[in-house]
């Protein structure tokens, strides 16, 4: 049956902590607490270990055969204590008699109750110390325990204060029978052959007591025969003493002629007076009162020293002595990797921890030994004779309070006579918390999913919230514990705090499905040749669309508003039995995103450069897009038929942009073309097909389709129409499609060039697709899935993310310097005086919306805030007019018209609707709208100067200044600055201007007039009046 360690400790009369250490030494691991359970086998193993330890430290003494013919050693005379106490000394029965007959021969010995080990139960019998005297050969014992030639018995007494023996203190400082006095070792005789010898009488008895020689303090611990120090208070000795084995102490037998040394019971006071062993153990002051009252009436015990041989435990085998073999060595303990890693995390090394534990144990043992004086039993104190009487203490609760204040508030033990014997308190172990992380290191990296909050990051990384918040504030981020942190911020935190963590984004259905589709590698056996995708890039009005019209055989230029391309187009044509896909991009500055999309989906980029203009800003942008896409570049030098063009100048400019012509040893092919006359068209087409053959473009038509959305629009009769280009696989009618925030099933597809319906589209094929729920974003990738619910979930997640970004608003960044300026000016917390321009934008395609947004981003002004309330694809509806009326917004329509309801509501409520078909016209009107909402600029215009010649005072009117206009003119409603003695003393509004008696609008130079100022009558002669006016001038964004 399992047993707790503390229950086994009570059974073995041990301390629970000591038994825990014994369990560890016995080889039983995982039992570091007194509440741990031990099985029957483990308990038996612990008992066997304790028995083995006791047998090893206490060897069984050799039995001495008793002989009557052997003379005994002389016994030293015992000091007579009757003079001090008035009572006769009693004998102390140390140990138990070797034979029952020997105990019966002593009729004066008091009856002792016998326990299981043969030890007397009750109070420990006091031991009488005898002075060192000269040997008395005439005092012969009738019996001798051993012959002269026989080996002397070795008797060990327990060194710990047991219940029945009382021979030593728990701290190991009690003196056993084998203690040395004056450098001589005492050798006692057996109890049967040592009769009590009366000590010398006192002076009152007629005999002079011999003078005790001065004794020096002997060492407390006894020495073994081999000279090795056996320290008192050892674990095996204490266990043997508490388990009933009385053979722990050792007494060296006397040799003939050597006197018996004094038996000591005091701990460290070796040179004090002899204690009275028969008086009650009261306080010193109470003992003095009892001595004055008279002698004690209690029965005095008869003291007798019985030095009988103490047999060892019968069930324990004799263990070899310490000198019989080499000293035991500790096993080599190799440090594991976990321990080494734990040391790096703040854990102490095993050796350092063991040394610290040993030092703490020695320190506690030392403190216990210093605070314990002559303990005969646990918690009982023996008061020496020479102790000075203490001061009279306080009574009642005051005494207890004072005791607690000086640290003596322990448990109080009351003696049999009602007096306090000893105050002691059990010291509790003090727990010191150290700020060191003692957790074992992780065996693998911590994974943190992003985005996460600051709290989640701290819990995952093991950092405190205060440290993370302090680091984020140091980075200039004012966040709270629930704020989200992105991937970059988490990386900065990990670097700052030296964390070895793995950051990963949360797994979603999109990542699971879309990533699998994108990363699926095609089998080389399934790849077939596909048509190349050729994109025309260049500056506006350089002839891109004209070149494409000549190659394709159509005329798109005439249908474009303003003669410029404002939409991206894609066509697939067959030329000499070989298919080529062409993509036309706008060249206007506003269509940067369209050019970037065209460069990303292309295989070959055709850079169209006008021979008369050369490299222009949008040409440089197109070069950067093509280089970023890492595609071959072919330069079409257009308009070569114009007079005065210099092809070498254009090629020099291309070389400056790292495009070296093949004619000059580079790798860029330059084809001279003319779209109007058709010059160089065949050469350009052959060059493109040759480059396609060299690169061997291929795709797998048997897999699910994926590609890019080039453009999307909302049509009234067909709904959402998306222009897609298939990059890999085959797209069929009925496929489930997800493209950005849009999803749906393919209902119909049309050819982009002819408009004919088609049922499937292979690689490098542009199509117009119907069936999506909303217009997808231009540039979004599309994928074909197997389940409509998965497509709906992915599209919904994308739409939610887009909504969160749009609703997040714009956070104004305030630097510390601007914050200080606002604080000093008292403008902190005040809203800026800005004018808001609300817009509702409707366009025919997603690409047009992107172009308009790009143009609006140019008009960033601190006094005007442009807010786009809604942007969408399709015509202007009644809801748009209602929203514009409620928010005082302007509706901008690009290539769309309002319906009848929207037009009538706009006329009724005064909503402004502006329609455009060319992007730069829309840009000019938006600029005018913004400039019209700017505050006009005030300019000061100087008009003239007048000198005050004479001053007239009229009671009802005021002071009139007669002036002479010396410069310029004085006009009505102007302002006047009054200058006197070279400085301006005031600035006032002109109230009245008269010439003779008539009010006039203006007085020219050289004329005299009368001037009256508003609110100022202190005009004096010789003052100078300066006339000026403030004009408001409309401001420009430039």
Curated annotation (Swiss-Prot):
Cysteine-cysteine disulfides: none
Keywords, alphabetical: Cytoplasm, GTP-binding, Initiation factor, Nucleotide-binding, Protein biosynthesis
GO CC term, one of those recorded: cytosol
Ranges for region G1: 538-545
Residue segments, region Disordered: 32-442
Pfam annotation, one family: IF-2
Residue spans of biased composition, Basic and acidic residues class: 204-217, 275-295, 331-344
Chain spans, region G5: 674-676
Chain positions covered by the region annotation G2: 563-567
Gene3D superfamilies from the UniProt entry: 1.10.10.2480, P-loop containing nucleotide triphosphate hydrolases, Translation factors, Translation initiation factor IF- 2, domain 3
Composition bias, Basic residues: 422-435
CDD domains: IF2_eIF5B, IF2_mtIF2_II, mtIF2_IVc
Main subcellular localisation: cytoplasm
Taxonomic superkingdom: Bacteria
Keyword flag Membrane: no
Region spans: G4: 638-641
GO molecular function: GTP binding; GTPase activity; translation initiation factor activity
Biological process per Gene Ontology, one example term: translational initiation
UniProt cross-references to HAMAP family, sorted A to Z: IF_2_B (MF_00100_B)
Protein name in the entry: Translation initiation factor IF-2
Lineage: Bacteria, Pseudomonadati, Planctomycetota, Planctomycetia, Pirellulales
């Amino acid at each position: 049956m399992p047993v707790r360690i503390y229950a086994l400790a009570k059974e073995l009369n041990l301390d629970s902590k000591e038994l825990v250490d014994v369990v560890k030494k016995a080889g039983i691991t995982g039992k570091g607490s007194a509440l741990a359970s031990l099985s029957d086998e483990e308990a038996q193993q612990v008992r066997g270990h304790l028995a083995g330890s006791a047998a090893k430290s206490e060897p069984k003494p050799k039995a001495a055969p008793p002989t009557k013919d052997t003379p005994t050693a002389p016994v030293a005379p015992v000091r007579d204590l009757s003079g001090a106490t008035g009572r006769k000394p009693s004998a102390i029965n140390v140990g138990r008699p070797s034979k029952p007959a020997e105990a019966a021969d002593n009729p004066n010995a008091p009856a002792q109750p016998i326990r299981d080990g043969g030890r007397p139960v009750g109070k420990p019998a006091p031991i009488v110390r005898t002075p060192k005297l000269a040997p008395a050969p005439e005092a012969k014992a009738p019996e001798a325990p051993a012959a002269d030639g026989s080996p002397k018995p070795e008797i060990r007494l327990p060194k710990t204060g047991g219940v029945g023996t009382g021979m030593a203190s728990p701290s190991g400082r009690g003196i056993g029978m084998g203690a040395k006095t004056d450098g001589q070792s005492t050798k006692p005789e057996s109890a049967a052959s040592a009769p009590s010898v009366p000590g010398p009488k006192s002076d009152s008895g007629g005999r002079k007591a011999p003078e005790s020689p001065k004794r020096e303090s002997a060492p407390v611990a006894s020495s073994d025969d081999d000279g090795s120090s056996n320290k008192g208070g050892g674990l095996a000795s204490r266990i043997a003493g508490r388990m009933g084995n009385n053979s722990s102490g050792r007494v060296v037998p006397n040799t003939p002629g050597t006197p018996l040394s004094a038996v000591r019971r005091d701990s460290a006071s070796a040179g004090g007076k002899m204690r009275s062993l028969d008086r009650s153990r009261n306080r010193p002051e109470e003992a003095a009162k009892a001595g004055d009252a008279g002698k004690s009436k209690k029965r005095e015990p008869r003291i007798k020293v019985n030095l009988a041989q103490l047999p060892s435990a019968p069930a324990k085998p004799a263990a070899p002595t310490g000198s019989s073999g080499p000293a035991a060595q500790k096993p080599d303990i190799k440090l594991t990797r976990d321990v080494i890693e734990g040391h790096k995390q703040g854990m102490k090394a095993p050796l350092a921890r063991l040394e610290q534990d040993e030092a703490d144990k020695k320190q506690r043992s030392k403190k216990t030994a210093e605070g314990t004086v002559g303990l005969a039993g646990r918690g009982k104190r023996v008061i020496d004779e020479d102790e000075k009487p203490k001061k009279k203490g306080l009574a009642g609760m005051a005494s207890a309070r004072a005791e607690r204040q000086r640290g003596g508030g322990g448990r109080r033990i009351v003696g049999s006579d009602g007096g306090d014997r000893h105050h002691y308190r059990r010291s509790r172990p003090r727990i010191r918390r150290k700020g060191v992380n003692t957790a074992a290191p992780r065996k693998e990296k911590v994974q943190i999913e992003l985005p996460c909050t600051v709290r989640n990051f701290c819990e995952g990384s093991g950092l405190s919230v205060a440290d993370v918040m302090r680091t984020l504030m140091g980075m200039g981020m004012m966040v709270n514990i629930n704020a989200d942190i992105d991937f970059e911020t988490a990386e900065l935190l990990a670097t700052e705090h030296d964390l070895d963590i793995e950051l990963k984004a949360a797994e979603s259905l999109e990542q699971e499905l879309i990533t699998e589709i994108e990363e699926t590698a095609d089998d080389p056996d399934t790849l077939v040749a596909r048509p190349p995708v050729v994109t025309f890039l260049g500056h506006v009005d350089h002839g891109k669309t004209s070149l494409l019209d000549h190659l394709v055989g159509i005329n798109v230029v005439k249908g474009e508003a303003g003669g410029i391309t404002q939409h991206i187009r894609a066509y697939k044509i067959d030329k000499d039995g070989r298919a080529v896909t062409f993509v036309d991009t706008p060249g206007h500055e506003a269509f940067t995103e369209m050019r970037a999309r065209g460069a990303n989906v292309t295989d070959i980029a055709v850079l169209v450069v006008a021979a008369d203009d050369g490299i222009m800003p949008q040409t440089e942008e197109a070069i950067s897009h093509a280089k970023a896409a890492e595609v071959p570049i072919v330069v079409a030098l257009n308009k070569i038929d114009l007079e005065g063009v210099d092809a070498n100048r254009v090629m020099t400019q291309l070389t400056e942009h790292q495009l070296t012509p093949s004619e000059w040893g580079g790798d860029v092919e330059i084809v001279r073309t003319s779209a109007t006359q058709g010059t160089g068209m065949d050469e350009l087409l052959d060059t493109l097909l040759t480059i396609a053959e060299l690169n061997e473009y291929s795709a797998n038509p048997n897999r699910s389709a994926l590609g890019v959305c080039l453009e999307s629009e909302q049509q009234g009769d067909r709904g959402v129409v998306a222009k897609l280009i298939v990059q890999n696989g085959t797209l069929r009618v009925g496929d489930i499609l997800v493209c950005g925030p849009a999803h749906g099933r393919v209902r119909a597809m049309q050819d982009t060039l002819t408009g004919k319906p088609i049922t499937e589209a292979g690689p490098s094929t542009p199509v117009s697709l119907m069936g999506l729920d909303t217009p997808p974003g231009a540039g979004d990738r599309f994928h074909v899935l197997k389940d409509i619910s998965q497509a709906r979930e992915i599209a919904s997640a994308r739409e939610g993310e887009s909504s969160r970004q749009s609703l997040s608003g714009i956070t104004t960044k305030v630097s510390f310097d601007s914050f200080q300026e606002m604080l000093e000016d008292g403008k902190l917390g005040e809203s800026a005086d800005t004018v808001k321009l609300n817009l509702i934008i409707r366009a025919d395609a997603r690409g047009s919306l992107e172009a308009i947004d790009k143009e609006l981003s140019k008009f960033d002004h601190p006094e005007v805030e442009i807010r786009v309330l809604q942007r969408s694809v399709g015509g202007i509806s009644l809801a748009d007019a209602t929203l514009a009326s409620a928010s005082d917004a302007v509706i901008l329509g690009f290539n769309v018209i309002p319906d009848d309801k929207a037009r009538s509501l706009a006329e009724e409520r005064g909503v402004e609707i502006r329609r455009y078909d060319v992007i730069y016209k829309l840009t000019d009107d938006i600029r005018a709208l913004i400039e019209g909402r700017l505050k006009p600029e005030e300019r000061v215009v100087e008009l003239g100067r007048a000198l005050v010649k004479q001053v007239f005072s009229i009671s009802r009117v005021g002071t009139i200044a007669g002036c002479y206009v010396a410069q310029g003119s004085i006009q009505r409603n102007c302002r006047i600055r009054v200058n006197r003695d070279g400085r301006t003393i005031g600035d006032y509004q002109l109230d009245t201007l008269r010439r003779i008696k008539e009010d006039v609008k203006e007085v020219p130079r050289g004329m005299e007039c009368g001037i009256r100022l508003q609110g100022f009558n202190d005009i004096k002669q010789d003052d100078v009046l300066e006339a000026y006016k403030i004009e408001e001038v409309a401001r420009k964004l430039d």
